[in-house]
Amino acid sequence: MIREFKSNPLNYNDIVFLGNSITESGKDWSKRLNYPNIKNRGIGGDVTDGVLARLDEIIYFKPKAIFLLIGINDLWNNNSPDNPSAEYIANNIIKISQVINAQTPKTKIYIQTVLPIEKEKFKNNILKVNEIIKANEKDNPYQTIDLYSIFVNENGLIKKELSTDGIHLNEKGYDTWVDFIKPVVSSIN
């Protein structure tokens, strides 16, 4: 991933897609959304603490906007008492927006809700993270984009037709995501 970042460096006023493997696997977001100033900064396996640790290299370029999708790996790794709670994860996501805003207040920040996955045991914590993010939007420098609602089926799990493995998206999933956020991206550019 670092090689790709070096071959496609950030520039001032870019739009940045920031997150984990779900964002990373979207590959060339500039082609998907038809805007040359969009850069992918998704890293497979990344967690909220990881994004916080690498924010400086993104903030330095004062992005026009940042679209953040992060949190599922924090939950996925939550198999021991040492791993973070839904509250910790949501608060880290909110903290990411606050750090961005403190250093580059003109950057528009869009927090995309954590997507559902096929594992039932994560359903309640995903909902809890998303609820905290939505409930705190008015007091923080971000807007919420509710991706969860377009990916969830009637059982509270990811729609099978949008996923390759119950977590990651297939092309139809990426097309669904792009169609949903395109009006927001167009309003920025």
Predicted regions and their residues:
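Alpha-helical scaffolding within the catalytic cores
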Residues: G50-F61, P84, N91-V99
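Charged, glycine-enriched surface loops/patches
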Residues: E87-Q112, K134-Y142, D146
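Cell-envelope and extracellular/periplasmic
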Residues: G42-D46, F67-P81, I94, V114, ...
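Short glycine-enriched, charge-decorated loop/helix-capping segments at active-site entrances
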Residues: S80-A86, L162-T164
